[in-house]
């Protein structure tokens, strides 16, 4: 049956390939569409029939053929176009035998469930949905008033459906191509305005990873800019323990001494000679609110700077840190509609005074203008970033939390300043009401004077109170044996307050106690809610009087209709995977399947506090343990840690683990880290942050590591050699043949090997980093394992380690995790951005080990297919001895500057006119384009992209031949937005039609850039990073 089906479709497939190209160039026939569908049906039917060989009633919704773009027939065509008859012969020429793992050693994943003897090799989509629901049900959804930076929220459904669950928002990449990213950039400008307004400071970045790492970034920024070169950071005792743990980790690599104390003006005066900055929590960890104005003034008199970790919702009614003199404010936007997700992801915020605007870490959105003099947004001051500063950088921040930042901005837009203030007032009123009831029943409140949402209560036995709370369906916080804490939030209602009355043996109903208070008011009180009781009024000396969020965007879109239209308006300006492939080299922009995404909004995953007792998070622990099993299986390591919130954070974590291990064996003097010059900028930045001295290793003209230089430097620095960082396949897109030898050299000289897993999409199921010789590696779950990029985050960068390093994996001060000698925390949450781990878990379980191997094969094949097609039009910078690449390749545009006056940037901008996002631009080599198609793109889409680049090459040739001038042509004027072609004046040597419809298919389906080319220099010289406060 299958053979006859294949024969019937062979002619159709041949015709399809021809018609695909005809359709792209304008022959838009219904036949081509039908043939395309026939081709896809063949692929799916093939997969189903193959599955029938092993099952009598196989699932028909298997995931692999939906994830991998080319069908088996397409792949055979690709192989033959490259001169190979099968995958085995192709892979033999791509991957050196010395690093290949025999397939017999990678057959199937086991199970973390001891009762599951024969787990499925892979799950179908419906089977996995059932599995995910069953695992989610292992979590116990008990309402948590634990606080400590994590709170129950009401995520507006309009934001959940239209942003969080919308691929036009979550599949975008970082907005490096500003002309096709204006919607996201505007939203992030809204976010920056929100943060700057609420903190009362001049400027905010576009998000960091979380509150703890934002605190660490602030400390290091102040240290690096202290003119007196002081090295002590004074930290108030009343801060969150997780933030303190992250500060200690960051301080270690920079030689910063942290002094923990109750900060007073007198202490500041006494410590002035050696302290560069101070850190306070506002409100404090126990819930107290202090007036830090005198403290800040004293610090300023000694040229110290003040960092305040703060709560955005509290700042809607409390004096802002900027008002009382803070120089930097950090925190989390979690309270602005972001579910707890067992610890993340949440956007960390960072705002500072004007003094530090050109030193602020992370990405910064600024207003500039385009070629047509219209206002437009862009990434500003990019020379601050780690990929340029490398080992001179004091921050390695790369991936941040763009999607979560955008969601929090929409939350502020939806509620507006008045709505946010209402929410904050209700929380404060509820806390005041509860405090009054507790005190009337004889309880002592530690922070009774001033507070916002948190109370610390003295009790006879904290354990008994927590047990009783649990019986009532609530989690409270144990402070110590005789104190408990609780933090109220926007979800609190009468039922919750009544339950808290019962937990603390207050033998009254909420209504009864309310009436007692209301009738005792000086002038009586007939209010029907708690908000207007005099005991629920914030003291004037703490109450905020300055205005905030006065820009129209925060005062217009309060109905769901208006918000929905605004969200859609913004997303229509941004190109995403919903529109076209995004072939960014080293970024792995693959499919983020809906089935993978569904679990993250399940309340049983979304609404779990990270500090709940372990038995309440068994579902999450299952996901984490299963991911560890699968990741260590495919990498050849022994243990894993999920705390790092990005790939760069994973680098830093892995290197910090190496340092801890070496100190434990008396080798703490080792401080040299060898890094190839081809490495991504985060590598040297991470090494410097971990306290290493970076020594670069040369590369040869063919892109390979210079083994002679490596050996010489390893020998020269043998006594101090700590580590070698290697990316494999290399950042030039090649499987180097000598990698095992290189790693052996490092081990022979006493060093450890750090393996950068940024390019793991070429290796899964084919090579094991641990078997090659690495001691530790990080993985990018937002690349290889399908967590979406979100427009610049979230990300997850777990590290996998060999057994000898496992004892040093990061710990946490609240939740038991990590190694027995674990380093202090690298993120606020014990398991990092746990809320999105189900995405990678879903991908791996639905693909199975064999499916993951097939994905790697497809990624390699797709890259080489495209490289072959483009090689007769552009020079390829590097290939191996067989003229093949790995999963990505580099096109050389350097010659065109001399021949046509255009460069890689011009090609990138012209691609926008073809409705494509550009490849990675000018990295790892200036004036080149690095292309990575991933396994998810179809033959049709890859051919469409190749045809676009080939067409652009012809446009360049016209300049070379004098048919178009060098200073006025299709490329240097690109992109061409609608405003451009609609202008009355047209002084171009090409038609308007050719400018915007260079190929006929674009007349049917085109994504329009919303602005013309940005003026980058103007934006940096005239830095403007917030919306004007005009209503």
Curated annotation (Swiss-Prot):
It is an enzyme of class 1 (oxidoreductase). Residues 1-49 form a transit peptide. Gene3D superfamilies: Aspartate Aminotransferase, domain 1, Type I PLP-dependent aspartate aminotransferase-like (Major domain). Its cofactor is pyridoxal 5'-phosphate. GO terms for biological process: glycine decarboxylation via glycine cleavage system. The modification N6-(pyridoxal phosphate)lysine is found at residue 783. It is found in: Mitochondrion. This is Putative glycine dehydrogenase (decarboxylating), mitochondrial. It comes from Schizosaccharomyces pombe (strain 972 / ATCC 24843) (Fission yeast).
């Amino acid at each position: 049956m299958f053979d006859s089906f294949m024969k019937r479709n062979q002619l159709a497939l041949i015709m399809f390939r021809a018609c695909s190209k005809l359709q792209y160039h304008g022959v838009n026939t219904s036949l081509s569409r039908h043939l395309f569908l026939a081709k896809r049906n063949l692929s799916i039917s093939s997969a189903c029939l193959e599955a029938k060989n092993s099952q009598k009633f196989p699932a028909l919704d298997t995931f692999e053929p939906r994830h991998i773009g080319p069908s088996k027939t397409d792949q055979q065509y690709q192989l033959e176009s490259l001169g190979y008859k099968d995958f085995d012969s192709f892979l033999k020429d791509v991957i050196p035998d010395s690093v290949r793992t025999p397939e017999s050693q990678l057959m199937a994943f086991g199970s973390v469930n001891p009762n599951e003897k024969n787990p499925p090799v892979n799950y179908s989509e419906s089977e996995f949905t059932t599995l995910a629901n069953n695992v989610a049900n292992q979590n116990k959804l008990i309402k948590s008033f634990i606080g400590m930076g994590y709170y129950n929220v009401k995520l507006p459904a309009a934001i959940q459906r239209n942003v969080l669950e919308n691929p036009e928002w979550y599949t975008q990449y970082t907005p490096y191509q500003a002309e096709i990213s204006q919607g996201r950039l505007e939203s992030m400008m809204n976010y920056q305005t929100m943060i700057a307004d609420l903190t009362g400071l001049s400027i905010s970045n576009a998000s960091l990873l979380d509150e703890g790492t934002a605190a660490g970034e602030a400390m290091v920024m102040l240290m690096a800019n202290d003119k007196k070169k002081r090295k002590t950071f004074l930290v108030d005792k009343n801060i969150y323990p997780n933030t303190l743990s992250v500060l200690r980790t960051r301080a270690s690599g920079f030689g910063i001494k942290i002094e923990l104390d109750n900060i007073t003006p007198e202490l500041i005066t006494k410590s002035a000679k050696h302290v560069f900055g101070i850190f306070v929590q506002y409100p404090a960890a126990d819930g107290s609110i202090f007036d830090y104005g005198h403290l800040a003034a004293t610090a300023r008199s000694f040229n110290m700077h003040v960092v305040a970790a703060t709560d955005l919702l509290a700042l809607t009614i409390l004096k802002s840190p900027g008002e009382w003199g803070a120089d930097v404010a950090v925190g989390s936007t979690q309270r602005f509609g972001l579910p707890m997700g067992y610890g993340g992801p949440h956007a960390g915020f960072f705002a500072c005074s004007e003094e530090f605007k050109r030193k602020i870490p992370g990405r910064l959105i600024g207003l500039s203008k385009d070629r047509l003099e219209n206002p437009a947004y862009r990434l500003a001051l990019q020379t601050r970033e780690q990929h340029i500063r490398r080992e001179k950088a004091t921050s390695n921040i790369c991936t941040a939390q763009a999607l979560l930042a955008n969601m929090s901005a929409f939350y502020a837009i939806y509620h507006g300043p008045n709505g946010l203030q209402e929410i904050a007032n209700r929380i404060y009123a509820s806390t005041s009401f509860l405090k009054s009831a507790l005190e009337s029943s004889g309880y002592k409140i530690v922070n009774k004077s001033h507070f916002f949402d948190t109370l610390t209560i003295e009790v006879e036995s904290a354990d008994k109170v927590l047990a009783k709370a649990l019986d009532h369906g609530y989690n409270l916080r144990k402070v110590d044996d005789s104190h408990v804490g609780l933090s109220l939030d926007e979800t609190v209602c009468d039922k919750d307050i009544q339950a808290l009355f019962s937990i603390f043996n207050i033998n009254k109903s909420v209504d009864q106690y309310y009436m007692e208070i209301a009738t005792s008011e000086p002038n009586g009180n007939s209010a029907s809610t708690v908000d207007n009781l005099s005991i629920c009024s914030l003291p004037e000396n703490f109450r905020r009087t300055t205005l905030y969020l006065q820009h129209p965007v925060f005062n217009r879109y309060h109905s769901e209709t208006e918000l929905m239209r605004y969200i859609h308006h913004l997303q229509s300006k941004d190109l995403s995977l919903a529109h076209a492939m995004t072939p960014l080299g080293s970024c792995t922009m693959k499919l983020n399947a809906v089935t993978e995404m569904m679990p993250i909004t399940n309340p049983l995953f979304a609404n779990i506090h990270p500090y709940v007792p372990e038995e309440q998070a068994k579902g999450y622990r299952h996901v984490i343990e299963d991911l560890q099993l699968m990741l260590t299986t495919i990498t050849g390591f022994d243990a894993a840690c999920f705390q790092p919130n990005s790939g760069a954070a994973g680098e830093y974590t892995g290197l910090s683990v190496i340092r801890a291990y070496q100190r434990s064996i008396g080798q703490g003097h080792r401080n040299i880290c060898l890094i190839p010059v081809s490495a991504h900028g985060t590598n040297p930045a991470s090494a410097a942050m971990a306290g290493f001295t970076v020594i670069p290793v040369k590369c040869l003209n063919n892109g390979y590591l210079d083994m002679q230089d490596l050996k010489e430097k390893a020998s020269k620095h043998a006594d101090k050699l700590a580590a070698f960082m290697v990316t494999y396949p290399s950042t030039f897109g090649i499987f180097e043949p000598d990698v095992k030898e290189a790693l052996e050299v490092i081990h022979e000289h006493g060093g450890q090997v750090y393996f950068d897993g940024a390019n793991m999409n070429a290796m899964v199921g084919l090579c094991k980093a641990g078997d090659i010789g690495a001691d530790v590696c990080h993985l990018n779950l937002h690349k290889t394992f399908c967590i979406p990029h979100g427009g610049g985050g979230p990300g997850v960068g777990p590290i996998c380690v060999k057994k000898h390093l496992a004892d040093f994996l990061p710990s946490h001060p609240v939740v038991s995790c990590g190694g027995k000698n674990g380093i202090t925390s690298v993120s606020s949450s014990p398991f990092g951005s746990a809320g999105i781990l189900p995405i990678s878990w879903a991908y791996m379980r639905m693909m199975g080990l064999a499916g993951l191997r097939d994905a790697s094969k497809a990624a390699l094949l797709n890259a080489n297919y495209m490289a072959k097609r483009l090689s007769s039009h552009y020079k390829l910078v590097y290939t191996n001895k067989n003229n093949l690449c790995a999963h990505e390749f580099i096109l050389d545009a350097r010659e065109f500057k001399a021949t046509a006056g255009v460069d890689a940037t011009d090609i990138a901008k012209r691609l926008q006119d073809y409705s494509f996002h550009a490849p990675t631009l000018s990295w790892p080599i200036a004036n080149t384009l690095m292309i990575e198609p991933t396994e998810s793109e179809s033959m049709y889409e890859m051919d469409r992209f190749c045809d676009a680049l080939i067409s652009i090459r012809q446009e360049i040739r016209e300049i070379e031949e004098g048919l178009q001038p060098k200073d006025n042509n299709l490329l240097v004027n690109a992109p061409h937005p609608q405003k451009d072609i609609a202008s009355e004046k047209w002084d171009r040597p090409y038609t308007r039609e050719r400018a915007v419809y260079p190929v006929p298919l674009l007349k049917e389906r085109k994504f329009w850039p919303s602005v013309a080319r940005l003026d980058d220099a103007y934006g940096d010289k005239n830095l403007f990073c917030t919306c004007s406060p005009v209503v």
